Structure formats: C-alpha cells, structure tokens
Amino acid sequence: MTRGNSNQPISYPIFTFRWLAIHGIAIPTVFFLGAITSMQFIQR
C-alpha cells in the first residue's frame, strides 16, 4: 500500500469508483432482502 502511493495517482479514483459501485449495489440488495424477510414474518 505504501509502495506506489504517490507514484500511481490513477489508482485513487478507481478505488472511489469501485467503492461507489459496490455500495450502490450492496445497500439496495441488503434493504430488499430485509424487506422481503420482514414481509414473510409479518404475513403470518
């Protein structure tokens, strides 16, 4: 991590983009799964 930190400034924006993509997919997925599970329990 220390190696190529200031030598590779292109690696920084990619990490941010990846973080946004992962969270953009993971948060709604977890919310959807939670909502479905809640409905299953509320149904009965």
Swiss-Prot record:
Protein name as catalogued: Cytochrome b559 subunit beta
Function recorded in the entry: This b-type cytochrome is tightly associated with the reaction center of photosystem II (PSII). PSII is a light-driven water:plastoquinone oxidoreductase that uses light energy to abstract electrons from H(2)O, generating O(2) and a proton gradient subsequently used for ATP formation. It consists of a core antenna complex that captures photons, and an electron transfer chain that converts photonic excitation into a charge separation.
Domain of life the protein comes from: Eukaryota
Self-association and partners: Heterodimer of an alpha subunit and a beta subunit. PSII is composed of 1 copy each of membrane proteins PsbA, PsbB, PsbC, PsbD, PsbE, PsbF, PsbH, PsbI, PsbJ, PsbK, PsbL, PsbM, PsbT, PsbX, PsbY, PsbZ, Psb30/Ycf12, at least 3 peripheral proteins of the oxygen-evolving complex and a large number of cofactors. It forms dimeric complexes.
TM stretches of this protein: 19-35
Alphabetical keyword list: Chloroplast, Electron transport, Heme, Iron, Membrane, Metal-binding, Photosynthesis, Photosystem II, Plastid, Thylakoid, Transmembrane, Transmembrane helix, Transport
Membrane topology: Single-pass membrane protein
